[in-house]
From Swiss-Prot:
Family membership noted in the UniProt record: Belongs to the NrnA oligoribonuclease family.
Function, in words: Bifunctional enzyme which has both oligoribonuclease and pAp-phosphatase activities. Degrades short RNA and DNA oligonucleotides with a length of up to 33 nucleotides, although the enzyme is most active on shorter substrates, in a 5' to 3' direction. Converts 3'(2')-phosphoadenosine 5'-phosphate (PAP) to AMP, has very low activity on cAMP and cGMP.
Note on how the cofactor is bound: Requires a divalent cation; Co(2+) > Mn(2+) >Zn(2+) > Mg(2+).
Keywords, alphabetical: Exonuclease, Hydrolase, Nuclease
Protein's name in the database: Bifunctional oligoribonuclease and PAP phosphatase NrnA
Broad class of enzyme this protein falls into: hydrolase
Organism, as annotated: Thermus thermophilus (strain ATCC 27634 / DSM 579 / HB8)
Lineage: Bacteria, Thermotogati, Deinococcota, Deinococci, Thermales
Length: 324
């Protein structure tokens, strides 16, 4: 089966997940992937609030980036754990592989809900559907099946996940279904203007850093690929999370890649369009993700070595797609 194909048993599997969660009497841990984005935080926080509304013993284990810290309340955070207690259930959301789940061990009864085509379908129960724009879209369906009464507090993080993974409805994954779901969530009292403002706010350090990043912009393969990186002496790594989105709109480009050096290697963020697969590029680099958006971490390499690997992988994908 094509890993990027829709899940043919989507509703059957999601109903089973809902039945299991309603029947669980022990603790439920909700976790997501390392370096969480809006979908990771939105889907996990929304499900956490829904389970709490059901009276479940739920724990939300996540570390949101600065621009998303307005969403959770202080008392909603739970500390990371090294071992789950007996009888615990783990719900892993938006995590393309078990090794990316952070804050909790992948053990106990594991439920895996995700929309990454490269997900290996881990867990005792898994619902993986790459046709969905966001894991938050899937969580919306799950919350409906749980029979929880929708409130603005539950709907706001869920809509956040959809907004961020669709680029505020600008990306190709914005389908009529996505817009219908968003409209329904708005009907539960989400303050859209306030939410979108908060999602776009960035600290002054972000704009100072922007100048340094833009000075590294380079064009390759006749402008088909645009790259940039975070200078190693720039600091403020957290402020660089969305710079790949800044360079993706260079006219004439079909691939954009942003690199940043970390202790374990170089993190590579990839975006693509025009029949080019960011997923294929990421897989060549040992990573994964979606066709239009993917990433990888090149362990043990410096920036120059990482650039060499990236250029080689992009060249192969541009050739496959007929651009070279």
């Amino acid at each position: 089966m094509d890993g990027n194909a829709p899940e043919p048993r989507y509703w059957e599997k999601m109903r089973l997940v809902a039945e299991v969660l309603k029947a669980v009497e022990g603790p439920i841990y909700i976790a997501t992937h390392v370096d969480p984005d809006g979908d990771a935080i939105g889907s996990s926080l929304g499900l956490y609030r829904a389970l709490k509304a059901l009276g479940k013993e739920a724990y939300w284990v996540a570390d949101p980036p600065r621009f998303l810290r307005f969403l959770p309340k202080e008392e909603e955070y739970s500390d990371p754990v090294e071992k789950l207690p007996p009888g615990a259930t783990l719900v892993a959301l938006d995590s393309a592989e078990p090794s990316r789940v952070v804050g909790v061990p992948v053990e106990g009864f594991v439920i895996n809900i995700d929309h990454h085509g490269t997900n290996p379908r881990f867990g005792h129960l898994h619902v993986v559907d790459p046709s969905k724009a966001a894991t938050a879209q899937m969580v919306k369906d799950l919350i409906d099946l749980l029979g929880v009464e929708w409130t603005a507090e539950i709907a706001t993080p869920v809509l956040t996940g959809i907004l961020t993974d669709t680029g505020n409805f600008r990306f190709a994954n914005t389908t009529p279904e996505v817009l219908r779901v968003a409209a329904e969530l708005l009907g539960y009292g989400v303050k859209l203007a306030e939410l979108t403002d908060r999602l776009q706010f960035r600290p002054p350090s972000y704009f100072r850093l922007m100048g340094q990043v833009l000075s590294t912009v380079a064009f390759h393969f006749g402008g088909l690929l645009v790259t940039a990186h975070l200078p190693e002496d720039a600091g403020a790594e957290e402020d660089s999370d969305d710079f790949v989105g800044l360079i993706r709109y260079v006219e004439g480009s079909v691939v954009s890649v942003f690199l940043r050096k970390r202790e374990e290697g170089v993190k590579v963020s990839i975006r693509s369009r025009g029949g080019v697969s960011a997923q294929n590029i990421a897989l060549k680099l040992g990573g994964g993700g979606h066709v239009p958006a993917a990433g990888a971490t090149l362990k043990g390499l410096d920036l120059d070595q990482a650039y060499e690997r990236v250029l080689e992988a992009v060249r192969e994908e541009l050739t496959r797609a007929g651009y070279l």
